């Protein structure tokens, strides 16, 4: 469960993180870097796609500056992931907390801008 989020920091299950991360079902990858910083591409989420969650949540940053192209969302869905939720990171945290107990879910968060 995500306990809190503020610009540059997220608290998950009692632990604080200050770098972009991916929450998998059984672990947290806390060094998530994208090839192009504020632009996400298929290579940046290959491991997520390989795990085929039912839901992928993408937090685009405090101000929502990370870009998620519609073409990428289409490619994600065509890979078998049923639902893709793209929101500013604060809103994405709320979505994650609503869904994580009842769905096979993975969430990727940009924590700053």
Give the predicted meaning of each segment.
Residues 40-50:
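A short, acidic, amphipathic alpha-helical segment used as a generic capping/interface helix at domain edges
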Residues 53-87:
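Mid-chain, well-packed structural core segment of small domains
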Residues 4-5, 30, 51-58:
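Terminal leader/tail segments of proteins
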Residues 45, 72-74, 93-96:
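Short amphipathic alpha-helical segments and helix-helix/interface helices
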Residues 1-42, 97-113:
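Non-catalytic interface/targeting segments
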């Amino acid at each position: 469960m995500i306990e809190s989020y503020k610009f540059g920091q997220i608290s998950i299950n009692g632990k604080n993180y200050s770098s972009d991360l991916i929450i998998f079902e059984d672990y947290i990858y806390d060094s998530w870097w994208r090839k192009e910083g504020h632009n996400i591409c298929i290579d940046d989420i290959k491991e997520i796609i390989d795990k085929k969650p039912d839901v992928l949540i993408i937090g685009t940053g405090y101000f929502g500056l990370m870009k998620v192209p519609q073409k990428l969302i289409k490619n994600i869905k065509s890979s078998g992931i049923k639902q893709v939720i793209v929101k500013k990171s604060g809103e994405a945290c709320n979505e994650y907390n609503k869904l994580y107990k009842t769905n096979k879910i993975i969430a990727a968060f940009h924590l700053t801008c």
